């Protein structure tokens, strides 16, 4: 590597000049370990190295960082460094061209940092705003969660904007959406921005003034809604959490929310989901990149594990909703409906979590294709409106940048400004600033075979936990030595002992969205109307339908929060069928895999990550299949 790699192929040292990048791409069964070597740079400074913005710790805390599962990443250094690399990679090199990390991407981070500081100042200066925000989720005009589609028109709300009453631009951190074609580096940029936010020297607090006193008077009840002056009603667990929060008041770093709108990513928790992941600088101020199976780090929802892994970057489980498709374009109407519910959950969090509010949103999106231009990028417009996006970043796509500028034309702003956006029913939404950034030269084109392997790995990891190098990693039948850092599972995900359980057909309520295929309306008999739409929920009947039994076998089911509290042992969750919106807006509690169907005994055998009672008997099926081989 340009004469700057030393040592054997198993252990070698790589010298990184200032503002350089060491890139590697792993193939199946390849593993790599990297550590930052102690010492000084040629200019006498302390060395530094980071991966997607996550700092590699050196000095007295020197440690090895493992990588596997076909990971593709880059080690960047601002001041220069020497790293030691163990293992082999099919592709590894020092980038010759300058990386945008040191110019455009870091400038974008500084732009977002200014907006976060402005939001913090606004919250500190307006104590009354905190009370208004906290009480907004209790406003009778605000649509109750999971009973009515947030954008549904009602008699009392003909404009369909009641769900947006909780939104206020004041004290709101940046809401940035990353756009670009497939394999443009969108997720990598999202991780870099999130890691830089977590590592920021800023303190995401309300300070010691009147605003802090008002926030102190707000308490969280057992139902997750904020009530004023509820100290006496706090459980012991909530009081303990409060004391821990007080200790964290001076912790540096922002608390952003990462939203994943790409259902093919599978992170978190699995493919076919849309998720909002609240981050915090504790326990670790970074999102690990050990495996592409955990694009945003590890958490209980990602792995099915009860305790978080040792390398968990965050202790808060994501809000995940089930889309049921890996490609949003297969049912874009349903995608928009799920996006509305996810955005509503984010707004509710921002109304009660002031750290997250001032830290803002970072939104990852699916790759834009040519066909999206035919309907004027309708899904992008809907997401911008739903999440009140104020900054759109376009990666490496000149035409898309021009199209976004036309759709959301507005001057760049650095203060809170609002404007009516077409189709917003008169809502005052933030002006949108469109920014074009270059694509990194290290971006790797991913084929469908790789994506299929990654999806299978994500599902397997959910049920079985992480994997180690172990003796299965052999060379000519001789086990290879375990690399540093690979004695534990990648990402700190613990190994699990999945458990099979048998459930009667009539006990598990399973729904799907629409039919697999719909005949055109013109093919229907004269005067007849369609009974099932592409957004309507259909309850499966495996007892009487052989087709439903076939569709269930080998499928992965999303277990959702029972809409009406759930039934007791041996009882279904619902005495009457819930509404579509009660199912669509319900958060995912976990997943089960349908391993077997017994048509004679009318029972279904499902695999869960661990033994114990299932968290729900209400499930949704989609296109996610997996065979446990």
From Swiss-Prot:
PANTHER family: CLEAVAGE/POLYADENYLATION FACTOR IA SUBUNIT CLP1P (PTHR12755), POLYRIBONUCLEOTIDE 5'-HYDROXYL-KINASE CLP1 (PTHR12755:SF6). Belongs to the Clp1 family. Clp1 subfamily. One of its GO terms (cellular component) is mRNA cleavage factor complex. The lineage of its organism: Eukaryota, Fungi, Dikarya, Basidiomycota, Ustilaginomycotina. Disulfide bonds: none annotated. Residues 148-159 have a biased composition (Polar residues). It comes from the Eukaryota. Residues 142-166, 562-582 are annotated as: Disordered. ATP binds at residues 21, 72, 183-188. This is mRNA cleavage and polyadenylation factor CLP1. Keywords: ATP-binding, mRNA processing, Nucleotide-binding, Nucleus.
């Amino acid at each position: 590597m340009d004469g700057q790699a030393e040592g054997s192929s198993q252990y070698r040292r790589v010298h990184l000049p200032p503002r350089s990048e060491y890139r590697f791409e792993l193939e199946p069964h390849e593993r790599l370990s990297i550590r930052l070597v102690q010492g000084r740079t040629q200019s006498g400074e302390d060395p530094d190295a980071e991966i997607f913005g996550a700092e590699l710790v050196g000095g007295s805390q020197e440690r090895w960082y493992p990588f596997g599962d076909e990971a593709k990443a880059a080690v960047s250094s601002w001041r220069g460094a020497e790293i030691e690399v163990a293992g082999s990679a099919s592709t590894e090199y020092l980038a010759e061209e300058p990386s945008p990390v040191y110019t455009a991407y870091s400038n974008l981070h500084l732009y977002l940092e200014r907006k976060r500081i402005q939001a913090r100042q606004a919250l500190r200066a307006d104590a009354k705003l905190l009370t208004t925000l906290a009480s907004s989720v209790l406003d009778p005009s605000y649509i109750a969660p999971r009973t009515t589609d947030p954008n549904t028109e009602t008699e009392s709300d003909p404009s369909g904007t009641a769900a947006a009453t909780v939104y206020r631009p004041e004290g709101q951190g940046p809401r940035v959406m990353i756009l670009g074609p497939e394999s443009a580096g969108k997720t990598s940029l999202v991780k870099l921005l999130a890691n830089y936010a977590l590592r920021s020297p800023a303190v995401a607090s309300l300070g010691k003034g009147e605003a802090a006193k008002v926030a102190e008077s707000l308490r969280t009840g057992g139902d997750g809604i904020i009530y004023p002056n509820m100290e006496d009603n706090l459980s012991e667990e909530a009081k303990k959490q409060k004391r821990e929060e007080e200790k964290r008041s001076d912790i540096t770093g922002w608390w952003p929310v990462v939203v994943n709108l790409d259902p093919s990513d599978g992170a978190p928790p699995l493919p076919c989901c849309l998720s909002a992941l609240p981050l915090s600088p504790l326990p670790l101020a970074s999102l690990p990149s050990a495996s592409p199976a955990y694009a945003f780090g590890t958490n209980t929802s990602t792995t099915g594990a009860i305790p978080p892994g040792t390398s968990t970057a965050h202790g808060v489980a994501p809000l995940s909703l089930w889309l049921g498709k890996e490609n949003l374009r297969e049912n874009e109407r349903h995608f928009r409906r799920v996006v509305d519910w996810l955005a509503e959950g984010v707004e509710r969090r921002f109304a009660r979590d002031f750290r997250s509010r001032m830290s803002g949103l970072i939104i990852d999106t699916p790759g834009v294709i040519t066909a999206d231009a035919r309907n004027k990028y309708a899904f992008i417009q809907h997401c911008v409106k739903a999440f009140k996006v104020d900054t759109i970043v376009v990666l490496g796509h000149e035409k898309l940048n021009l199209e976004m500028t036309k759709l959301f034309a507005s001057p760049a702003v650095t203060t809170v400004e609002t404007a009516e956006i077409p189709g917003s029913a008169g809502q005052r939404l933030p002006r949108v600033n469109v920014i074009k950034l270059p694509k990194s030269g290290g971006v790797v084109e991913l084929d469908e075979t790789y994506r299929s392997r990654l999806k299978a790995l994500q599902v397997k990891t959910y049920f079985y936990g992480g994997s180690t190098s172990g003796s299965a990693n052999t060379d000519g039948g001789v086990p290879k030595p375990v690399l540093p850092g690979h004695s534990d599972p990648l990402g700190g995900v613990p190994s699990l002992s999945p458990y099979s359980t048998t459930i009667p057909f009539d006990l598990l309520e399973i729904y799907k969205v629409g039919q697999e295929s719909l005949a055109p309306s013109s093919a229907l008999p004269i005067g007849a109307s369609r009974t099932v739409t592409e957004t309507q929920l259909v309850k499966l009947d495996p007892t009487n339908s052989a087709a439903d039994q076939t569709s269930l076998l080998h499928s992965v089911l999303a277990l959702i929060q029972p809409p009406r509290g759930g039934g007791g042992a041996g009882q279904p969750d619902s005495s009457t069928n819930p509404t579509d919106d009660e199912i669509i807006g319900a958060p995912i509690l976990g997943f089960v895999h349908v391993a077997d169907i017994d048509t004679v005994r009318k029972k279904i055998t499902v695999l869960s990550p661990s033994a114990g009672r299932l968290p729900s008997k209400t499930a949704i099926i989609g296109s996610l299949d997996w065979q446990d081989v």
